[in-house]
């Protein structure tokens, strides 16, 4: 019995990526992904300038204020991406464990700062501001990937009730090693985000972790059942948020009645509707002239729809879909399961942010404060 058990474990716990070849740093697939990213970044700069030059001039005295900020952030992001490409994945696996405790301390420290609009989400040091939930998202991607990839993989094995030893192993691996242990570190993070409160951060972080587990087969059908149960519990969860004032205000403004909508959502729908098929033309938006709040960040997609119309909106959505699809292909070609899960997690964050932002702008879901990547 013990010999058969060892043979089963040796045979069934080896990870084999769905696509067997590592794409390498300069493969055609990686170059195509970087080209798509460059197109999205260039498109974003053009649209940000169009949406922000009036606001920048009137509020900051510089029509290029927001463009300068964005270019600086892009340069920092590209530098970090280039630096991370030289970091060995074994170092990331080691570093994600102590970094988890640092992230918890950062989230707790956020609660000590004065609230802004009823929420404590930022650490302010001098002129610098850091939203700790963004750091927490990346840390949870690394830690979830580490814990889930450390669990044994059981391949296509399906236990029989007569094989009690193998059934016990199957349940332990599927439930404890592949679901509970990877998800357990998420609980303290969610508790601290609730205390801020930061519900959009909770939704995104949970969705990212769930996507990693589902797309890599962790937990098998049990993970999909858990996701279905979470979807069924969504409405009771929305009922519970009535105790949180600002969340209830956002839910109250989410309505099919145009007169009941808040000014931000109403102006967003006006911008989308006035764009039509081809739009008013680049730079010709009316709503960006201080009519549409947050036209330079959360609601910039409305300006895209107004100036470039339905065609422009579809174009940017297709570009994001292409970026995510190429990223997933790179992830599935990674040399080990940890790298695959990290790649899936990063693409999941982009995908969920795009979905939530466009859904908010079109009044499909309540306002979450999630920006377009």
What are these regions (language model features)?
Residues 2-40, 46-197, 358-373:
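Membrane-helix boundary/helix-loop-helix interface segments in multi-pass membrane proteins
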Residues 79, 87, 143, 242, ...:
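Transmembrane alpha-helix boundary/anchor motif
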